């Protein structure tokens, strides 16, 4: 997702921005540091691919630690849908509550559970959002998140509101190379 920049190119863009240099418990290579800092500077997702157990998830944790940020982790499974990262609407509970005469039924927002992207978008401070093992999901999963990750916003159809990132999160996406990711996703 991010093409590494040279140290000189990255240095010009860093200014007073956050800069990851590793942590006392994690020594990052120069190439890895450049890739992370390019993603931070350009405010673009960083895709980390590699075999299981090679430290992809740990990198995200160390980036959060090194930059003094909270980390939100969205673990992807074969059944995960992109919509779950945004929000889930519980229509069944709302129907049940309407039959029971519950007052809360009048506000549809009472039946919306915020996903990890929504939580990251509304965080008061910048956070690191880890989307872990994206290749475990359906082949269309990554493409289903393209617009949300590009624009850092999404529409909640049930309430009519648009959720926009208050502070653009640092998005780190990991892949175990179990499946090929869509070209459109990789180009971004």
Regions found by a protein language model. Name each.
Residues 15-32:
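Dynamic helix-loop-helix/coil hinge segments at AAA+ ATPase domain boundaries and subdomain interfaces
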Residues 28-29, 37-43, 121-124:
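Phosphate-binding P-loop
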Residues 47-80, 91:
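Walker A/P-loop
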Residues 69-71, 183-188:
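A short helix-turn-beta junction within AAA+ P-loop NTPase domains corresponding to the substrate/partner-engaging
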Residues 86, 91-124:
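Short glycine-rich substrate-engagement loop in P-loop NTPases that contacts/grips substrate
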Residues 111-112, 118-126, 156-175:
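AAA+/SF3 P-loop NTPase mechanochemical coupling elements
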Residues 114-116, 121-149, 180, 186-187:
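Conserved AAA+/SF3 P-loop NTPase catalytic/coupling segment centered on the Walker-B
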Residues 140-164:
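Conserved catalytic/switch belt of AAA+ P-loop NTPases
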């Amino acid at each position: 997702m991010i093409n590494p920049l040279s140290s000189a190119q990255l240095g010009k863009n860093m200014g007073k921005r956050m800069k990851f240099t590793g942590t006392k418990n994690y020594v990052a290579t120069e190439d890895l540091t450049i890739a992370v800092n390019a993603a931070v500077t350009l405010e673009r997702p960083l895709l980390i691919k590699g075999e299981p157990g090679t430290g992809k998830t740990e990198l995200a944790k160390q980036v959060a630690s090194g930059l003094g940020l909270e980390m939100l982790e969205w673990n992807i499974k074969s059944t995960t849908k992109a919509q779950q990262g945004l929000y889930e609407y519980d229509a069944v509970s709302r129907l049940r509550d309407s039959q029971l005469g519950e007052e809360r039924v009048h506000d549809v927002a009472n039946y919306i559970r915020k996903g990890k992207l929504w939580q990251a978008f509304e965080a008061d401070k910048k956070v690191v959002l880890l989307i872990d093992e994206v290749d475990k999901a359906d082949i269309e999963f990554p493409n289903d998140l393209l617009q949300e990750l590009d624009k850092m916003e999404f529409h909640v159809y049930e309430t009519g509101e648009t959720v926009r990132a208050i502070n653009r999160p640092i998005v780190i996406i990991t892949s175990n190379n179990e499946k090929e990711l869509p070209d459109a996703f990789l180009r971004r």
